[in-house]
C-alpha cells in the first residue's frame, strides 16, 4: 500500500520548485493534492496535470497566501471539494535579501507576510478541520538559516525561525487533538534560485557540506512524505535539517 493512500494534502506555493516536487511525490504515494499559488497560469495548470497523471485528484487554487480571508476561503473550498485535509504543508515563500542597514521596510514586511503570516493563516483555517477528524499533520518549510541566521537575510532568517517556533507551538497546543506539527529546514538545495549563482559561489557552498553535494528537491519531498505519513506518527514539534551535514 502506498504511504499516503486516501489522504488529502494541501500545499501552498506549489506550482514550481520544492513545492511542486513535494506535490508530485505525494501523488506518487497516493495522496490527493490541492495546491495554491499566487496565480494558476499555464505553468500551474501543467503542474495540476502532472499531479493528476498519478491517478489522484488534483486542483490548483489561485490565492495570496499572505491574505487571511483568501486563505480561509481556499481551505473552505478544499474541504468541500476533497472531503478532508489530512496534511498541510506551508511552503509559500519569497526572498528579498539585503544588509540590515540597506533593507527597506517593504522588504521586511513582504518576506514576513509571505513566509510566516501565510503559515498562520493556513494553520488557523485548517486546524478546525483536523480537530474534527482527530488527526492531521502540519509541515512548515523552514531553512537552516532559520536555525543559524545568515548575513544579508535578516528578514528571511527571522521568517524561517518563526516557522520553526510556530510548528513547535502548534505541536504543543494541538497534540492532545491528534494533530502533529513539524518543520523541515533545507540547506543548499539545487533549485532555479541556487542554479543562478555563479560557479565559484556554488563550489564554495558545496565545499562546506560534508556530503559534498547540494541537495535535490526530491530530498526535501521524501522528508515531507515521512512527516506526512504514519511512519512519523510519534514525531511532533521537531525540526528536520535536510542539509547534507552543513550544520551539526
What are the functions of these language-model segments?
Residues 128, 172-176, 233:
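Alpha-helical segment proximal to the catalytic Tyr-Lys
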Residues 120-123, 213-242, 247:
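C-terminal substrate-recognition "lid" of short-chain dehydrogenase/reductases
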Residues 143:
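Residue(s) in the substrate-gating loop at a strand-loop-helix junction
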Residues 99-100, 107-112, 194, 205:
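Substrate-binding pocket helix/loop in short-chain dehydrogenase/reductase
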Residues 29-46:
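Conserved glycine-rich Rossmann-like NAD(P)H-binding loop of the short-chain dehydrogenase/reductase
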Residues 123, 159, 167:
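Active-site helix of classical SDR
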Residues 41, 62-74, 105, 218-219:
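The beta1-alpha1 cofactor-binding region of Rossmann-like NAD(H)/NADP(H)-dependent oxidoreductases
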Amino acid at each position: 500500500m502506498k504511504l499516503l493512500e486516501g489522504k488529502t494534502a494541501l500545499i501552498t506555493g506549489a506550482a514550481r520548485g520544492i513545492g511542486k516536487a513535494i506535490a508530485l511525490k505525494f501523488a506518487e504515494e497516493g495522496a490527493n493534492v490541492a495546491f495554491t499559488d499566487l496565480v494558476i497560469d499555464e505553468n500551474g495548470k501543467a503542474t495540476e496535470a502532472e499531479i493528476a497523471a498519478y491517478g489522484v485528484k488534483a486542483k490548483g487554487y489561485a490565492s495570496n497566501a499572505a491574505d487571511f480571508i483568501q486563505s480561509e476561503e481556499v481551505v473552505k473550498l478544499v474541504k468541500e471539494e476533497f472531503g478532508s485535509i489530512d496534511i498541510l504543508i506551508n511552503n509559500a515563500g519569497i526572498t528579498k535579501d539585503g544588509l540590515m542597514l540597506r533593507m527597506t521596510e517593504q522588504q521586511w514586511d513582504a518576506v514576513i507576510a509571505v513566509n510566516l503570516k501565510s503559515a498562520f493563516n493556513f494553520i488557523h483555517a485548517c486546524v478546525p478541520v483536523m480537530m474534527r477528524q482527530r488527526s492531521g499533520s502540519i509541515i512548515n518549510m523552514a531553512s537552516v538559516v532559520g536555525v543559524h541566521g545568515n548575513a544579508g537575510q535578516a528578514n528571511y532568517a527571522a521568517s524561517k525561525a518563526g516557522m520553526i517556533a510556530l510548528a513547535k507551538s502548534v505541536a504543543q497546543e494541538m497534540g492532545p487533538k491528534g494533530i502533529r506539527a513539524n518543520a523541515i529546514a533545507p540547506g543548499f538545495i539545487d533549485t532555479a534560485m541556487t542554479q543562478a549563482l555563479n560557479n565559484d559561489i556554488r563550489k564554495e557552498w558545496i565545499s562546506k557540506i560534508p556530503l559534498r553535494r547540494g541537495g535535490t528537491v526530491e530530498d526535501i519531498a521524501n522528508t515531507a512524505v515521512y512527516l506526512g505519513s504514519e511512519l512519523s506518527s510519534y514525531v511532533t514539534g521537531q525540526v528536520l535539517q535536510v542539509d547534507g551535514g552543513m550544520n551539526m
